[in-house]
Structure formats: structure tokens, C-alpha cells
């Protein structure tokens, strides 16, 4: 009996440690999103060591070794099933949207190809890459019909409308801009509000799995795979389900 109680205690302790770790990851993700959202574009490029034309091919290859592929491998089938069920409960959000977000897609990316001899004279290349190959610092282009492939910071937006119902349950389209707090014309979030600020309210950030309803945008990839906002939430939900 004592052995059984000890086992239960150890299990509870391990679950508690895991829960704390997940909460820490969620907080780090939130802090990163807020920091990137409130920086100016030049500062964002400096943070990710990228340029307006994107990463070099060589650097992108290095980063995929560091960050891994942009995909969610754990409990993927269960997540897909839950999303499909939710899609039937949310008006206007079709199962096709969910399928589009889960299937292998490609996205338009700009990268720089340098001379193999000198490493200089970079040539800008526009290419369609599988979303799994995206890394932080990549420059991507979004337009109507696209599923957002990663957490991204918008640097240019043209009448951009996004459906975030997969995260919020609210089917109303949300307009996104180049600047955080565009409507209030503020650049920085007050420190006293920072702790409890909801990342989903950031007006210049789009989240992995959300859907472009209208307009177009250019954006920098902030987080990929399990490190995205939805990726961390999926991890938490998978543990509790």
C-alpha cells in the first residue's frame, strides 16, 4: 500500500513538473511574441539576423538543424480529429479549411542565394517551399486562401483579414496591420499590462493554423513547429486529454 502511494506521489510530482515546464514554455512564447510585435521592422531583422530579402540558403539550412522541421509530430492524429469536430461547431469555418491547414502545403518564401566561391553577390530568389522547411527568420508571403504556416510578424499588410477561430472560437475576421496597437496608435504595451496581455490581441502577429480570408502580407517567421503558440497549446491539451 505504501509502495502504491509512493508511486502515485511520484506520478503526481512528474505531472506537476511537466505542467510547470509547459507553462514556462507558454510564457516564453508569449514574451517573445510581445517583444517582436513591439519592435520596429529594422530591429526585428536584427533580432533574427535576417534581411528584407530573407535568409541565405546556407543559413536556412543551418537553422533547420537547430530548430527542427516546422511540424507537430506528437498526437497529430488526435489534434486533427479535434479540429475537425470543432470545425463543425464554428459557423463559416469549413472542414476544408482544417484539411488545408493539416495537409502538406507550400508557401512563397524569399531567400538569398550567394556565390559558392565568394559567398557574396547574393541573388534574391522567390520559391515555393514545403511549410515544413520554414525556419525563424524566413521571409514569407501570405494571400487569401493561405493557412498561416508558423507564428509570424507582419512587416507589410494590404487589407489583411485573418480567421483565428481555430484558436479563439470566434469566426469574425480580424484585420491585421504592420504595427502593434495600430488602432490606438501606440507602439509599446504598458509594463503594468504586459504580464496579463493576451498575445492573440497583437495586431501585427499571425498565428500558425489561422486562415487568411482576404488581402495579402509579407511577414517574418518568428516560431515554428512545437514552439509556436498553437504548438505549445496542443502539447498542453494532449497531456490533459
Features from the language model and the residues they span:
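Conserved cytosolic headpiece of P-type ATPases
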Residues: 1-241
